[in-house]
Amino acid sequence: MASDNRVYVFDTSLRDGEQAPGFSMDPRGKRRLAHQLAELGVDVIEAGFPSASPNDFQAVFGIASEVRGASIAGLARATKGDIEACARAVEKAERPRIHTFISTSPLHRLHKLNMDKEQVLAGAVAAVELARRYVDDVEFSAEDAIRTEPEYLVEIFSAVIAAGARTVNVPDTVGYSTPDEVRELFARLKREVRGAENVIFSCHCHNDLGLAVANSLAALEGGARQVECTVNGIGERAGNAALEELVMALRTRYERYGLITGIDTTKIYPTSRLLQNITGQQVQRNKAIVGENAFAHESGIHQHGMLKHRQTYEIMNPEDVGLSKSELVLGKHSGRHALKDRLTRMGYRLEDAETDKVFTAFKALADKKKEIYDADLEAIVLGITGGAASSFILKSLSIQSATGETRMPTASVRLATPDGREVCEAAVGDGPVDALFRALSRAIGAEITLKSFHIRSISFGSDAQGQATVEAEWNGQEHVGRGTSTDILEASALAYLDVANRLIKVRAREALAEAA
């Protein structure tokens, strides 16, 4: 047990967060985010659900093998197969944790598990005992704990603590509770659970009623000392408690809570930006702590007050969360050493071969735009290290568009194919982007159903890079592709091809599975 005022931050962006539609990440993106979370100072990184799929297993195994500075956890149902898979996935971690769970509420016992209280209790104890054979650090979660009988929670937590659990987690799985209820429940559990003084109580709050952060703070007041959260509050349905909001609430209102975390708050904004770039999903402008408007002041009255004294309308300093105007860091005359130094200060550790690729892409971009910002460099790095391996490669594209009643936008593309050939196709469409996607679909020979398409600027100025995100469906599976360029049509084409290249990987895996 640590000091009573230390709060452990358990980040589940890579597991609960990544399960949300539109937030899927490829393996390299997951590893990059895991490294950033370790630099941020989170205590536990829940890297995934190893038994969910071979890809999830490999992602957890890769993170456990290379990320240091934080405990690496994998999620496992209370079954032998799940726990053994999780143990293998985290075995290379510096500090491995198995996080096992079983549903405990009457609703889940009856309709999900078809088990009675005694069976659930026995399953929970057996799961913890099995997990302890592999690791010393075992966390147990009572799924849907908030809707579970409090006296039964006391019984089951007492039993799993006796079986060897070091952390017991109380999830508000459906975001149903209120702060007063959460505070009272945690206080009761701390009083009545046998062995409570030997473990850490944890909260895991969902945001269905917009109360995830408030409920998490209430849990801390009730005696919890671990908070489970995600960067930007991502997660299933309405999301999870937002890491940045929890951490800054504790820091800003220390006089009320008297609690500290190990988070380096100056890395909060860069971490938020990294997640946005990996997933292509922006936070809303008025998002607390990391939104574009979080430290903006439009009102004349507010601006006047800010000029007089900053604290009249700001309770935090932007610099405290790592937010400052993106500095102009490099230009076309900058050399390799300056680039590598800047990337290192941004938190990127690249192999020499990756640095060479980034430098080449940087020089090409510097010829197109005068000012290179951190966000530009970040997009280059993620494009080099984070995407699917190129299979179809865009060689050229041409768009002809016109306005008026007789307009008929036309797009033609030339691609290098996976087998080394070149293919050219053209198509007309309702607009230039539609024509472009139709031409690309013909060229790759696959019918991809477009679900959504959006593009955003990732830096500043009229020559800023645009990042296009394509969400598409193929054979019942959803895929997300991203592309970045100073030309928004080229960015759109690259995003579409990113989806196509991911499909090739899926087809290859399916072929191997059938052959096996």
Task: Describe each PLM feature range.
Residues 478-480, 484-513:
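Mixed-charge, glycine-accented linear interaction segment located at domain edges/termini
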Residues 6-7, 13, 248-250, 254-426, ...:
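A mid-to-C-terminal "edge-of-domain" accessory segment
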Residues 7-9, 16-44, 57-66, 80-201, ...:
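Alpha/beta enzyme core
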Residues 174-177, 184-308, 313:
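Catalytic alpha/beta core domains of metabolic enzymes, predominantly
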Residues 69, 171-173, 228-236, 252-261, ...:
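Short beta-alpha connecting loops at secondary-structure transitions
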Residues 49-50, 75-78, 102-103, 143-145, ...:
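Short, ordered loop/turn segments at secondary-structure junctions
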Residues 19, 24, 32-34, 371-479, ...:
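Non-catalytic terminal/interface segments that mediate subunit docking, oligomerization
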